[in-house]
Regions:
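Short, acidic Gly/Pro/Ser/Thr-rich loop/turn segments
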Residues: 1-2, 94
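Conserved alpha-helical substructure of the radical SAM core
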Residues: 2-83, 161, 172-179, 183
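Radical SAM enzyme [4Fe-4S]-AdoMet core and its adjacent flexible, acidic
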Residues: 18, 52-53, 57, 83-90, ...
Length: 189
């Protein structure tokens, strides 16, 4: 549903028969932690079945999502209140919407986070893939997550077979590093 600048999955969407099946999930060994990611996991119509099966195998499950499908996320969380949800917000509003290629994406993701907090969900937080375009938003976004009492997780821009993208690179490494330093200083206050 998104057109993220660091992931071309939308240009080459997988076919349903190429996605991991419930039968395959049943064969997985026991795990301590499982992260369900995408593309966008909430596009799957069998996500509840996947979560149900994974809870037989995993102590902790977190779903990484862009938070766009608020009603689906809330519905799943009502059935599985112990699940973790990490909503990818790639910066403040304009930056997030440009990187994610989703008009109103920031408001949808932020609104979903607020809704989950209002529901009493405990394991919720922000996720941010840091790159040149959004590094200046690191500290402001951290402050928002901190005010909401939520985890703030970061990853550095990288390439992956699953992204259908091999050209991701941080061009201004000193600027990005300085913004990470600013975040560390904020955390140490």
């Amino acid at each position: 549903n998104a057109r993220c600048s660091m992931c071309n999955r939308y240009k080459a969407p997988s076919k349903p028969e190429e996605e991991i099946s419930i039968e395959t999930i049943k064969k997985l060994p026991k795990m301590y932690f499982t992260n369900i990611t995408g593309g966008e996991p909430f596009i799957r119509t069998d996500l509840k079945d996947i979560v149900r099966e994974l809870y037989k195998k995993s102590d902790r499950i977190v779903i990484s999502t862009n938070g766009f499908f608020t009603d689906r996320i809330v519905d799943l969380c009502k059935e599985f209140p112990q699940i973790g949800i990490r909503i990818s917000i790639e910066g403040l509003e304009q930056t997030n919407n440009e990187i994610r290629g989703l008009q109103n994406g920031y408001q949808r993701g932020y609104g979903t986070l607020k809704k989950l907090r209002e529901m009493g969900m405990k394991d919720v937080g922000f996720g941010m893939t840091v790159q040149d375009k959004n590094a200046p938003d690191l500290v402001p976004l951290y402050k928002i997550s901190n005010e909401m009492g939520m985890e703030f997780a970061t990853a550095s821009l990288h390439n992956s077979f699953y992204f259908v993208e091999a050209k991701n690179i941080i061009h201004d490494r000193p600027m990005v590093a300085k913004n990470f330093e600013n975040l560390v200083n904020e955390l140490l206050r």
